[in-house]
Each structure stands twice: as C-alpha cells, then as structure tokens.
Curated annotation (Swiss-Prot):
Forms monomers and predominantly dimers. Cytokine that may play a role in anterior neural induction and somite formation during embryogenesis in part, through a BMP-inhibitory mechanism. Can regulate Nodal signaling during gastrulation as well as the formation and patterning of the primitive streak. GO terms for molecular function: BMP binding; cytokine activity; morphogen activity; protein homodimerization activity. Keywords: Cytokine, Disulfide bond, Glycoprotein, Secreted, Signal. GO terms for cellular component: extracellular region; extracellular space. GO terms for biological process: anterior/posterior axis specification; anterior/posterior pattern specification; bone mineralization; cell migration involved in gastrulation; cell population proliferation; cellular response to cadmium ion; determination of dorsal identity; gastrulation. The gene is Cer1. This is Cerberus.
Amino acid sequence: MHLLLVQLLVLLPLGKADLCVDGCQSQGSLSFPLLERGRRDLHVANHEEAEDKPDLFVAVPHLMGTSLAGEGQRQRGKMLSRLGRFWKKPETEFYPPRDVESDHVSSGMQAVTQPADGRKVERSPLQEEAKRFWHRFMFRKGPAFQGVILPIKSHEVHWETCRTVPFNQTIAHEDCQKVVVQNNLCFGKCSSIRFPGEGADAHSFCSHCSPTKFTTVHLMLNCTSPTPVVKMVMQVEECQCMVKTERGEERLLLAGSQGSFIPGLPASKTNP
C-alpha cells in the first residue's frame, strides 16, 4: 500500500510536465503564426499610413503652394520641438537665422578671403582711399580711370612718406591710337611750416612730393590725320619732398615728408 502511494506521487509530476510540454508546444505553434500575421498587418498599416502622410523633412517647392509650405513648416517646427535639442542643433546649423546669414554675406563682401594658413590678408580700404586720391589729384577726366588700383600701403597714407608708385599711363588723342606707357607717379604727404612774423617777415613753406629725377620723352602717335601728333611725356624715376615758399622758390627738403605730383604736366625745371 505504501509502495503504491509512492509510485503515484512520483508519476503525478511527470504527467503534469508532459501535459505542459504538449500544451506549450501547441500554444507556441499557434502564437508564432499569430505573431507573423500581426507583423505583416502592422507593416501594411504603417506603409499605408506612410503613403497617406507626407514626409515632413522633404520639401518640393515647385509642387506645393505657399499655404502648404507654411503648413509644412509649422508641422516641422512642432515635430522638432517635440524631439528636443537633439534635432534643434542640426536645424540651427543648416538653417541659420537671417541676421546671421546677412552678416556673413556682408562681411564676405567687404573682407578679402583669408589664406589657408591663417595669416591675415591686408584689406583694401586704403587702396580705395588711394584710388580716390588718384581721381582727385591725378586725372579728373571722368570715369575712365575708376578701375585703377594703386599699390599703396596703408601706413603710408597716415605717415609722412614720399615715393614712386608704378602705373600704366595711357596717352590718347583724337583720331589716334592709344599708347600705354610704363611710368611712375609721386605719392606721399609732406610737411608744411610757417614762421611767425609781421607782414613780409612771415614765411610759409609747403613741401610737395615732387619728382627729383625724370626724363622727358617725345612720343609720336599713330593717327589718321595727315598732321603728325607728338606728345611729351614725363617719365619719373625718383621722388622727394620739395619745399615751395610763398615767393615761388622751390628747393629740396632733406628732412621732410610727402605730397602729390601729376605726371604729364609741364615742369618748370628739369632736375637730372
């Protein structure tokens, strides 16, 4: 009797285990097709939903109107606000504000492109000032020479200097071919001084950056008229500050500075 009870106690858990194995296998076999069917249904539903809803991150400007574009922008802004800072960073990087973009464009228009090694390139305000100086004191012949840029350094505009600046001088005459001559102009600023006194005893000295060494060249132009046309051109080689007093006396200022000289004007003196 006791032996029979022991056998029943041993066989009872084994029977439950067999039933559980069969039931679990049948349940697993049933749940796997259900899972695959659910996945297919979910994929189809997501695909249909994706076809119905437009992509918020793709815009076709030529296919949408202003109202649709504005609605897309609003939806995109809402979505980005929900996603948080992770999506806002690329938004600010790829779409900068208008004021930042305008500042970048304006600075790019005004500044010269810097080289790759990081060295600063000299900007051109002084070249523009030199060009205005050129128009005001050198030519005054209209807009024909507006594109001329002189190789003048920035510090030379503010300090006292006097030197030769190379440029291409165009010699022109009516019914004649233009001739371009390599020449130099005197550029700089020179000092001025006035000694105190009364009446005739007061003396004023103004120094000018003038040529101290130059040659005069007679240039014959090729013209259609039978009368030959000859132009006199002053080719400047060296420049220094020349002092001119109120009485018309002109002499070299050894410890002086700078002024301006117009090439081509007739000179009263020729200094070798």
